[in-house]
Amino acid sequence: MQTQFIKTIEFERPGMESGSSCVAHAWARTPATPSPEEKIALKDRIRHLLKEREAVLVAHYYVDADLQDLAEETGGCVSDSLEMARFGRDHPAKTLVVAGVKFMGETAKILSPEKTILMPDLDATCSLDLGCPVDEFHAFCDAHPDRVVVVYANTSAAVKARADWMVTSSIGLKIVEHLHVQGKKILWAPDKHLGGYIQKQTGADMLLWQGSCLVHDEFKAVELELLKKEHPLAKVLVHPESPAAVVALADAVGSTSQLIHAAQTMDAPEFIVATDNGILHKMKMAAPGKIFIDAPTAGNSATCKSCAHCPWMAMNGLQNLLDVLESGRNEIHVDPEIGRKATVCIDRMLDFAAAQKANVRPSSDLAKEQKLFSGIGPA
C-alpha cells in the first residue's frame, strides 16, 4: 500500500471584530488508497471487529463511499452530523465509531457520555471549527450580551457550551424565525454564508461571525451560470453554506438530507450539485439513472475545475478505521462540565423540533416545491 501524505490547507480565520479575518494554515493527512484485494481484506476484518467489540459505525455523507457502504451493511448509519449522534445515542452498542470530523465525534460524546466514541483520525477537523476559536468567541459574546447566541453544529464542544441554541442547516430557519418573532437579537456563529441566508429569509437582527466552510466558499457563480448553459435541463442543488451569489442560482437550497431528497424526487434528468462531492454516492443510490455534475469551484488555489471535497473528511479511510478498532485508540473525550453546558443548547433544539413536529423548512424560493420537503430529518 502506498504511503499517506500530508498537505497544507489555507482557510479564512476571522477575528473577533465582524468583517476582520486573516489567512490561516492547517494540514490534512490523506490516507493511502488500498488495492481492490486490500479493500476486501480490510472490510472483512472491520466487520468482524465491529461485532466483536459491540461497536457500531456511523458515517457522514461526505466520507469515502467504502465507509458509507460499510456503515449501512453492518447496521450503522450514514447521515448528517446530528442524526449520526442521535443514532449512536439510541443504538444499544457500547462503542460508537464516527467517520467524519472531530466536532461530530464531540457531539456524539455529548449525547452519549457513557459510551466510548472512537474516530479514525482525531486530527480530522473543520474550517468552521478552526475559524471560531473559543477564546475569541467568548470575547465576541461578551461584547454583545444583549444577543441570543445561536451556533451552527459545525463548532467545538467548548463553543457549544457558550451557546443558547445549537442549530443544524435544516432547522436553523425555524429557530431563528421563532426567536425573531419573540423580538430577540441574535449573535450567530460561525458560518457567514449560512447566517446571511437565514438572515435574508427571516429578516432577523443577526450579528454574524465571519467564518466559512473552505469547500462551499469556493463555489463560483459565474462558472456555475456557464455550466447551467451547457446543461439546460439540469436543476441546481445548493447547500446554504455557499456564497449568496451561488445560492441565488439554485433550484433547491437545503441541508444534505434535503438535497438528497430533492435529487430523488424532483423531475429532472440532471443535477448540478454545489456541496461536498462525497454526497454524490448517496445521491446516485437514491436516484439511479439520474446524472450528477459537480458544481465548479476553480478557486485561486484550485488544481481542478471542481474539487469540492473536504480534505479532513478525506482523512477517514478503511485502514485507520481498522486501526482504531484493533487498538481502541483515538477516543473522543469531552470535559464533563463543558459537555453538560453544551447539552443545554442541543437539547433545546431537539425539544423545539419535537414541539414543532417539523424538522425542516425549505427556502422561500422553493414554495412551489413544499411537498418535496415534508418529513425530512435534520442535517
Curated annotation (Swiss-Prot):
Q: Any idea which UniProt keywords this protein has?
A: 4Fe-4S, Cytoplasm, Iron, Iron-sulfur, Metal-binding, Pyridine nucleotide biosynthesis, Transferase
Q: Name one GO cellular component term.
A: cytosol
Catalytically driven reaction(s):
iminosuccinate + dihydroxyacetone phosphate = quinolinate + phosphate + 2 H2O + H(+)
Record's PANTHER family? QUINOLINATE SYNTHASE, CHLOROPLASTIC, QUINOLINATE SYNTHETASE A
> Which pathway is this protein engaged in?
Cofactor biosynthesis; NAD(+) biosynthesis; quinolinate from iminoaspartate: step 1/1
The compartments listed are: Cytoplasm
| Listed GO biological process terms | 'de novo' NAD biosynthetic process from L-aspartate
The protein's required cofactor(s) are namely: [4Fe-4S] cluster
What Gene3D superfamilies does the entry give? NadA-like
Q: Which residues are involved in binding [4Fe-4S] cluster?
A: 126, 213, 310
Summarizing the function annotation, the protein's role is: Catalyzes the condensation of iminoaspartate with dihydroxyacetone phosphate to form quinolinate.
- EC number(s) on file: 2.5.1.72
- A single Pfam family it belongs to is NadA
Superkingdom classification of source: Bacteria
Record's protein name: Quinolinate synthase
Report a single Gene Ontology molecular function.
metal ion binding
Q: What is the lineage of its organism?
A: Bacteria, Pseudomonadati, Pseudomonadota, Betaproteobacteria, Burkholderiales
